[in-house]
Amino acid sequence: MKLVLAEKPSVAQSIAKVLGAAKREDGYLEGNGYVVSWCVGHLVELAQPEVYDAKYSKWAYADLPIFPMDWQYEVSAGTKKQFGILKKLMAREDVASLVCATDAGREGELIFRLVYHKAGCRKPFERLWISSMEDVAIKEGFENLRSGTEYDALYEAALCRERADWIVGINATRLFRPFTGRP
């Protein structure tokens, strides 16, 4: 059995139709040797500063800049149910491997990998890389799956972008907020 993880429900439904996974369950579709589920965007995100150190719960200029030494991730508040479903699916004994079917690009790769790592999954995964949701493109994509490790550099680039955004965003917001007159 392969677990296919798409970025959004609509994409998962298109993929499931092509693969013959027609049995609907809560948060996924199953059939024909496949379980097809989805992420609903970013299920896992970087933790807020106060998770790293309680002193960051109060904004103080003296605490800037904030540079985490060990990056921490949390399941997004509004996606805990779907994350729980994905974690259970990844742990199923009959699921031997996964297919990353998130959007073809840096962010899609990041979305899949963060869920995969946060769920503690160690099963092998392959990458579906398609730019069309036409049935023929999906079928061809599944006939040409690539090893997930071929996209490690793309994942690393996404991590760098995400962490750089966090560093600039958190520090700039805390630095300049007093000058805006907003609490």
Region annotations inferred by a language model:
Residues 183:
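Functional cation/ligand-contacting sites centered on basic and imidazole/sulfhydryl donors
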